[in-house]
Amino acid sequence: MKERLPKSVYKSLIRTIDGGEPLDMSVADAVANAMKDWAIEKGATHYAHVFYPLTGATAEKHDSFLSPNGGGSAIAEFSGELLIQGEPDGSSFPTGGLRPTFEARGYTAWDPTSPAYIMHTPNGAVLMIPSVFMSWTGEALDKKIPLLRSNAAMNAAAQKVLTLMGEEEIATLNSSCGAEQEYFLIDEKFANARPDILLAGRTLFGASPAKGQQFDDHYFGAIPERVQVFMQDFEDKLYRLGIPAKTHHNEVAPGQFEIAPYFESANIASDHQQLLMTLMKTTAKQHGFFCLLHEKPFAGVNGSGKHNNWSMLTNTGKN
């Protein structure tokens, strides 16, 4: 963005990201045009507002950049209005009982504090725009809005305490998070023979293992070569999307592993975790594996957790 935007527009965008200032529509138009040009250069044909409804999974609607110009042809177009707000059908998403289905209207709104990215697939590329999802009256219909509101409330309360402690040079305080994702890898042919794994992501019946941690694939043990190939491919995809993968290793149970990215602001870390889990499953399939993210896929051996290393971080770098 710094290379593509006028200096005044870029500074205005940074004030919105860092300080929460309202975004002027002229700035939004310039940002949207720069994002469109960058995305098209990278092969993208569509854009999507990515949000996290109460289903517990990601959601997205792909829209083309092409727009008819009335002369029998089309142009690539992406305005600030389209960047800031989208309107998916809210009737098919859970609301927690906030409203009846026939009144369900939903809006996505761009979250400028989380970087946009381009998702490449065998069938093309899409500009993905992290967003919130809300009702027309502003009620949160997703899991990102409560996180952003919690961060804002924490910042406001902490500022008062820091001022009393003499830390007046601190302008903002944010939460940071480094999540450790544990997972199991099993051969795809074994997963395909188990309807419970395919449907529930875990085993519902079976015999206890003969041994657990007594094999050589124990905690911090040598990583099997086939798994190492998967990990290298997977982490390469993470780096391409700006996800700072830091550590990977064998976990306690046989066939269990862990990936731990470097800590980031909690909002970005949360977005990156959703993306990480999606990439983990698709990359595992490309290597003949089936990835299990269920917290307890097998009885009698350790389950998979996601430790959150959480802290409060000031704009001056103090924990």
Task: Explain the meaning of each model-derived region.
Residues 106-319:
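Glycine-rich, acidic/polar active-site loops that bind/position phosphate-bearing ligands
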